[in-house]
Amino acid sequence: MELLLGREAFLRLAEALDEPARVAFRPNDGKGFRVAGTLAAVPWSSYGHYLNERPAFTFDPLFHQGAYYVQEPSSMFVEQALRVCGLPRKVLDLCAAPGGKSTLIRSCLPPESLLVSNEPVKLRAQVLVENMLKWGHPATVVTNNYPADFGVALPGCFDVIAVDAPCSGEGMFRKDNPALEEWSTDNVMACASRQRSIVKDVWPALAEGGFLIYSTCTYNVEENERNVMWICRELGAELVKLPVDAAWNITGSLCSELSGPVYRFLPHLTEGEGFFLALLRKTVPVSQGNRRTKPVVLPKLKEPALSWLASRPEGWRLWQSGDQQWAIDGALAASVGQLLSALKVLSAGVELAMVKGRKLQPLQGLALSHCCCADAFPRVAVEGEEALAYLRRLSLTLPPSVPRGYVLLTWQGQPLGFVNNLGAHANNLYPQNWRIRSGYTTTIDNKFIERVG
């Protein structure tokens, strides 16, 4: 980095890395939340704001309700790239876990656009499912596939593909010591090679004229500028300029071989971690390939589950995977059916219910969805200790006046999750793998977000 930046700038960068990282978050406007107070805004994001300190988010029920997402501020610049892409109908976030960029992309997209959030590593994909379900938007699919699966089965399918490529992690040295310990020039070159393979494999799935948002959280030119040059030269693409305010202090190319628009975030100049982004437009036709799959036809959703959801102009369709049911917006049924036939889909639309004999048990995704019908279930408001007990998946006792059966608990007016009230006690239906494992018993006093209205 000293060779790239010069001695003085390098020393300023090193000094900045000794300072604590800034904490930022985005409220979920889809659920009616906004920033409270006068927190400093992340200048390149319509949604992001800085916090003055890092609270214990784990003990804030609103965090588990998907009221906001904690995200590294530099990476929120993806919003600027996406806004140049027009109104895409289908977007793929290829390396999406844990979900920060996907939840941001989802907030920026028109409601009718379909977002596919993918993660090839199974355990990380489960975390992605959790975070996307908490965000609550129904036009979202989560998959567990490799890049080539998209390139082979879905040629020209996507208008935008975001690749936040696995990298050497130089931009995370401040907060991630393992990244520093694992760094080597050999690892940098291996990462650069893997990144090219990832982009090459998924490239056929991008429509002609479509956009690739390529990003990393590292500094070196091999994984950044030189990979961008390779994509343009070998795959057929051109760089696209983004509207950038000079006051943001974003740095351009550090490689003399590339003069086109790329965007670097350096911690001594911007309040965030190291980040690189380039927006590229595909300039070559799509090869349709040979593989064809017949889309899955989704039947109409019926009662009683239909009454659990707010109405849609084209109704709701049903996808059942084993004993688990999902509700798909009828307007997206054909697109989701195509994905179901070609990919390993982990979640799609609204996580609705589990089949229990002849009955349906409502699931957590329904409680946290934008589309959960407000009067479909009896509601009971809980206080701080009860909310944390629920999130720890402990048994609860409800007031005698509460009817038996499925009850939706709320915290600060926002759905928290379901219980099955048996009278003497209520069975906790919170997902086992989502539960709070810490025994700490306090809730944080969240004063940085509020409900609109």
Q: Which role does the model predict for each range below?
A:
Residues 118-156:
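S-adenosyl-L-methionine
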Residues 88-97:
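Conserved class I S-adenosyl-L-methionine
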Residues 1-36, 273, 283-453:
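Polybasic, low-complexity RNA-engagement segments
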Residues 158, 211-214, 218-327, 331:
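Class I S-adenosyl-L-methionine
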Residues 123, 159-201, 213, 217-225, ...:
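Mobile active-site "lid"/loop adjacent to the S-adenosyl-L-methionine
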Residues 110, 206-208:
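Helix-to-beta-strand junctions that scaffold the AdoMet/dcAdoMet cofactor pocket
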Residues 86, 151-164:
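A short acidic, Gly/Pro-enriched loop at the edge of an enzyme's catalytic core
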